[in-house]
A protein has these predicted regions:
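Pocket-edge positions in alpha/beta enzyme catalytic cores
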Residues: 12, 46-49, 74, 99, ...
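Canonical Radical SAM [4Fe-4S] cluster-binding loop centered on the CxxxCxxC motif
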Residues: 12-52
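Conserved, mostly hydrophobic/aromatic
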Residues: 24, 32, 71, 100, ...
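A short acidic, helix-capping loop that chelates divalent metal ions and anchors anionic groups
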Residues: 40-44, 108, 130-137, 199-204, ...
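Radical SAM/AdoMet-radical enzyme domain recognition
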Residues: 51-71, 78-193
Length: 334
């Protein structure tokens, strides 16, 4: 079946859904403070969607008008069968952008193969340029390995490479300028993300770790000419700025200070197959159950369309409080 010419995924607030974030594992070789507990108990493998189920899910969504799929985790590149998955996703009719979010620890060996499979854009997490601090934030990560992975991604020829940085007031707030200069030197982009109030963080509580995007913008505007960039139709929530005199952009993802709910174009499928309407709410349907119950493609697509009545107008993040959403980012899809 060919993808339809007009979108079928429209919620009750007239938001057109054309972007799916697909988590393929909750497992990761890092234990980042803002993402998961240090003693995280991972899902039984039988509870995670199989490669075949992931490919079927992606195909059904493209048939419903989704144009962009971002593969997330956990760390996607440690998933068994990930090569097969990317080749299948890259061949989907109607899919315009296949993207990946990764911690970079496996990119040195896989970047070229990902480009060949059809991955066009890649986001790489990098929260510090100091080896000791990087290890403190990730608990297990090796900075040099990630830096080599970033350089491999640049050399591989992705259409866009972006660094994602979560800034925490008690840890890495002082690295805004060095990280931006790092991106500029490699002619890649960088996005600074306000810490999401999910799971836990150990730096004095989430409210104390919070850093506003506006403060970062103001700091960088003192060093660079920043010109707001027009977002692509399938773009995520980042507000991007061209950095004058460079080939790089800086973005700010601001769930607290400048929420992006009014233009939300996304749905999420978690590693265990929950179709989540919103990162900051618990409304979902059990897509895994639908896939494993022998339902036809049309029946599953009908359930997906019907589920959009649950998509809320906005998230319920509330910075001064501790997290209202108890699931961790690795289980949701970062």
């Amino acid at each position: 079946m060919s993808p339809p010419q007009s979108p079928q995924l429209i919620d009750r607030f007239d938001r057109h859904i054309n972007y799916l974030r697909l988590s393929i594992t909750d497992r990761c070789d890092f234990r980042c403070q803002y993402c998961m507990a240090e003693t995280m108990q991972f899902l039984p493998r039988a509870d995670v969607l199989s490669i075949e189920e992931l490919l079927r899910t992606a195909r059904l969504f493209t048939e419903l008008g989704v144009k962009k799929i971002r593969v997330t985790g956990g760390e996607p590149l440690i998933r068994r069968g990930v090569d097969e998955l990317f080749k299948g996703l890259g061949a989907l009719p109607g899919l315009e952008t296949l993207a990946l979010t990764t911690n970079g620890s496996h990119l040195e060996k896989t970047a070229s193969e990902l480009v060949e499979a059809g991955v066009k854009t890649i986001n790489i997490s990098l929260d510090s340029l100091r080896a000791d601090r990087f290890r403190e934030i990730t608990r297990t990560g090796d900075l040099d390995t990630v830096l080599r992975g970033i350089d491999a991604a640049v050399a591989a020829g992705f259409e866009r490479v972006r660094i994602n940085t979560v800034l925490l007031a008690g840890l890495n707030r002082d690295e805004v300028l060095p990280l931006t200069q790092f991106a500029i030197a490699r002619q890649i982009d960088i996005a600074f993300i306000e810490e999401m109030p999910l799971g836990q963080v150990t730096v004095g509580g989430k409210a104390l770790a919070y850093v506003s995007s506006q403060s970062l913008h103001d700091e960088l505007a003192g060093h660079f000419d920043l010109e707001e960039s027009t977002a692509a139709p399938d773009a995520g929530p980042s507000r991007d700025y061209l950095i004058g005199g460079t080939r790089s952009r800086v973005g700010f993802i601001s769930p607290h200070s400048n929420n992006f709910c009014g233009t939300c174009n996304r749905l999420r499928v978690s590693a265990e197959g929950r179709l989540l309407m919103c990162l900051g709410n618990e409304e979902s349907i059990d897509l895994r159950a639908l896939l494993r119950a022998g339902n036809s493609d049309e029946a599953i697509k009908s359930s997906i369309i019907s589920s959009l009545t649950m998509k809320p107008e906005r998230h319920v993040f509330d910075r001064p409080d501790e997290p209202q959403i108890v699931r961790f980012m690795n289980a949701t899809g970062g």
